[in-house]
Amino acid sequence: MARYTGPSCRLCRRENTELFLKGERCYTDKCAIKRRNYPPGQHGQGRTKTSDYGVQLREKQKVRRIYGILENQFRGYFERADRLKGVTGENLLFLLERRLDNIAYRLGFASSRIEARQLVRHGHFTLNGRKVTIPSIQVKAGDVLELREKSRKVACINESLEAVVRRGIPQWLELDKGAYKGAVKTLPAREDITMPIQEQLIVELYSK
C-alpha cells in the first residue's frame, strides 16, 4: 500500500479525531476538524450506520495514521505484539510509542511525527552517542537522544522546542532543552498514552 500524500487534515476529518499531522496548526482554530467536524466528501454530513467491522477498521486506520505506519508495517507490529507477554493491544501501542521518530516528536524536536521521521532520516540525531537514520528503531529505558551540533541552528527544530510546552512531554521521557537532548526514563505505561485509542478493536479486527 502506497503512502498517503493528500491533505493531512482530510484524514483527521475522516477519522473524526485530531491526529496532529500538521504540527502547530492542529493546536489552533485553523484545525480542520474544529471548523468542519464531519467526514470529507459529498456525503460527509449525511448519517451513516457503521457495522462492527467498520468501527474496528476505522480504529485501526486511525492508529496507523497517527503514527504514520503503512499497512504491512502495522500488521507486522501487531504480530510482534501478539507474541509478547501481556495484553496484545497494549503491547502494540507500546511498540509504536517506542519508535525513534515518535520519541523525537514527543520530546519536541519536531512539530509532527512526519517531520520527526524526516529529521531522523536526514541524520540530525544521535542515539547514545551514535548517529542514527532509522526512524523505526525501538528505544529502551536509559537511551539518550541528542540533536547533533550542526543541527542546533535549524529554525524549525528550535521553533518546535519552544512550542513543546503547549502539548507537554510524557512523564516517561525527560528533555534537557538547553543541551538539545532527551532521555527515556522508563518504558511507557498504558496511562501514559492519552490519545483516544481503543486498541481492543484492532485486536478484534485482526483476530477475524
From Swiss-Prot:
Pfam families, per database record: Ribosomal_S4, S4
SMART domains hit by this protein: Ribosomal_S4, S4
Cited InterPro entries: Ribosomal_uS4, Ribosomal_uS4_bac-type, Ribosomal_uS4_N, S4_RNA-bd, S4_RNA-bd_sf
Domain S4 RNA-binding: 98-158
Gene Ontology CC entries for this record: small ribosomal subunit
Keyword hit for Ubl conjugation: no
Known role: One of the primary rRNA binding proteins, it binds directly to 16S rRNA where it nucleates assembly of the body of the 30S subunit. With S5 and S12 plays an important role in translational accuracy.
Database matches in HAMAP family: Ribosomal_uS4_B (MF_01306_B)
Entry's family note: Belongs to the universal ribosomal protein uS4 family.
Record-given protein name: Small ribosomal subunit protein uS4
Gene name tied to this protein: rpsD
